[in-house]
Amino acid sequence: MIKDPFARLGLDREVLTVTQLNGRARVLLEDVFSNIWVEGEISNLARPASGHVYFTLKDSGAQVRCALFRQNAARVRQALKDGLAVKVRGKVSLFEGRGDYQLILDTVEPAGDGALRLAFDALKDKLSAEGLFSAERKVPLPAHPQRIGIISSPTGAVIRDIISVFRRRAPQVVLTLIPTAVQGREATAQIVRALQLADARGFDALILARGGGSLEDLWCFNEEAVARAVDACVTPIVSAVGHETDVSISDFVADVRAPTPSAAAELLAPDSSDLQRRVDNLHRRLVMRMRDRLVRDRLRLDGLARRLRHPGERLRQQAQRLDDLDMRLRRAFERSLNTRRERLIRLETRLGAQHPGRQLALLRQRLDSLAERLPRAMREGLKGRRLQLHSQMQTLHVVSPLATLGRGYSILLDDRGQAIRSAGQTRPGQRLSARLGEGELQVRVEDNHLTPVTLSLLD
């Protein structure tokens, strides 16, 4: 330790000029601080055309100017930038012209998180170039998972927070913890093994979670082995490492990144009450659409039924209606008979204590009479319906074109299917179709003559 540096330089009596003072101060500084290490953060980085590098090294309380000349700057491997934490080695010197002291550097290395940040950026760029972060590799999360694997430490607030969210929002989900170290030398290998085991278990989704910490504490989630294990998983993975401001390589590779472990649980545990409301809403919409569809189909069916004009279809409709009336009449008869019987039983029960024999006999007679009249009325009604149906069938048969053809007439049709009503509609050699009562003939016109038809009244 120098007790009296001024005595060493012979400055106890001498009066110096400014130039002399700065020169001797430079010698003193370079002698005492000739090879020192200093740690701080780069700011005001400048790279002039000379190839030298100039920047300010600072911490929370002070700053010092630094110079890294071209020959030494070429040996620095990492890219220097503002905000980078570094350790520098060099000597303290004084720029005599301004009286400013500075560090003349020969070595610059990343310091603390700075080195880790450089490694982080390098791995991030490498995996991004390989496509591990692309959206095409992401697997969508299941809407309603039933079994979820949690890869995290078995102790601490993380696992408790995740379980609490699922108990509140989706208690039916089965949670399985795959315990692993989340910090330290063994953490990387354990996390890789846990991911492989969990992916083989057939879970609906996985949560990779850890609480907050420094970049060094979270570093196992920035290891390439962990990133590739996450990418190899078939099961959808939610990465929830650190606090909201923390970002890890596993966040980029995972299918979904959650800001916190609790947020990861909420992504996979939709609120049961919300689901119930959605189900109720969908049920109401389904019922309304079914009703609308039934109404439209019924209207369409009615419209089609009104457009039907074929005699056979009309007959089938009448026959079906007759069968329906028959069944309705039978059911009405049975209901009436059952009603009468039930009423008689009730009356017998109410009057049983008084033995109303005469009234009971009258009621039985009336019941027998009704039972005898109802079948007769039913038969007469059916007979009338059959007669009415027979009459309608005869009427339809008389006006049916098929009946006319059956009496020996035919209908001539041209090649467009148009009926020939006059010889003037034909030409010699034209081919026509003759529709008969049974079958069809192909004929050819030999000649055509227009002969007026004269109707005469017979005396």
From Swiss-Prot:
List locations, semicolon-separated: Cytoplasm
The EC number(s) this enzyme carries: 3.1.11.6
User: Annotated Gene Ontology MF terms?
Assistant: exodeoxyribonuclease VII activity; nucleic acid binding
Q: Name one process (GO BP) from the record.
A: DNA catabolic process
The broad enzyme category this protein falls into is: hydrolase
Q: Which residues cross the membrane?
A: none
Give the matching Pfam families: Exonuc_VII_L (PF02601), tRNA_anti_2 (PF13742)
Q: List the disulfide bonds.
A: none
Oligomer status and interactors? Heterooligomer composed of large and small subunits.
Q: Which NCBIfam families match?
A: xseA
The protein's job, in short, is: Bidirectionally degrades single-stranded DNA into large acid-insoluble oligonucleotides, which are then degraded further into small acid-soluble oligonucleotides.
Similarity annotation: Belongs to the XseA family.
- Name of the protein in question: Exodeoxyribonuclease 7 large subunit
Q: Which organism is it from?
A: Pseudomonas fluorescens (strain ATCC BAA-477 / NRRL B-23932 / Pf-5)
Lineage, uppermost ranks:
Bacteria, Pseudomonadati, Pseudomonadota, Gammaproteobacteria, Pseudomonadales
Q: Gene that codes for this?
A: xseA
